Curated annotation (Swiss-Prot):
Sites where the protein binds Mg(2+): T19, D57, E118
Molecular function, one GO term: magnesium ion binding
Family matches, as HAMAP family: BioD
Pathway annotation: Cofactor biosynthesis; biotin biosynthesis; biotin from 7,8-diaminononanoate: step 1/2
Superkingdom assignment: Bacteria
Organism: Burkholderia thailandensis (strain ATCC 700388 / DSM 13276 / CCUG 48851 / CIP 106301 / E264)
Protein name (record): ATP-dependent dethiobiotin synthetase BioD
Catalytic activity: (7R,8S)-7,8-diammoniononanoate + CO2 + ATP = (4R,5S)-dethiobiotin + ADP + phosphate + 3 H(+)
GO biological process, one term: biotin biosynthetic process
Cofactor: Mg(2+)
Amino acid sequence: MSAPLSLFVTGTDTEIGKTFVSTALLHGFARAGLRAAAMKPIAAGAYQRDGVWRNEDADQLDAAANVALPATIRTPFLLKAAAAPHIAAAREGVALDIDTIVGAHRRACERADVVVVEGVGGFRVPLAGTRDTADLAVALGLPVVLVVGVRLGCISHALLTADAIAARGLAIAGWVANRVDAAMRFADDNVDTLRAWLEREHGAPLLGDIAHMSPPSPEAASRSLDVNRLLGALRETAPR
């Protein structure tokens, strides 16, 4: 039996479509015949339904996955305040422990063929003490998919984020252009520039260019993603 596959989804910023792309990937993996699960290890911003605290991003991941994970595995740390996680955690007296997340990820991988782990905010978001989400990605040891919100300033944001990922010794399995600004001028030129620079500097291929969608459709977006190429990259780096 082959080892389960997993990847870490990060982005150039918050609100650039990490959850949207993660759910699109889940649809693509399911269409490829894989048992696909998702984790949102740290979620900040919760609402209550039927006496249970929930998170909108986690709900979307659950809806797209074809393997359901217990909430304690899918989201070990659910914070009520919609704020930076270290701020929300401090206000709630919660210690954001990376080892707890690593253990939850191990259990998730026992239940699925592929596990999508969605980060929180950008690549470097403080968690506790001197540790941040980059440390979480390193502890998980997963290849990274970078989501680039295609809007003004995205070239610098993407290149800086890619450099930060590489500086931590992590492989960039690829990147996704998510066109969040329908009115952006020269969007194609920005994507072409990033395609050349990220391939040349980090060997990171463009896995998909997702058009602006209103309303967004993860299932439709999944058809813009080269899931087979991503799976090939994940299999190359998976433990033997």
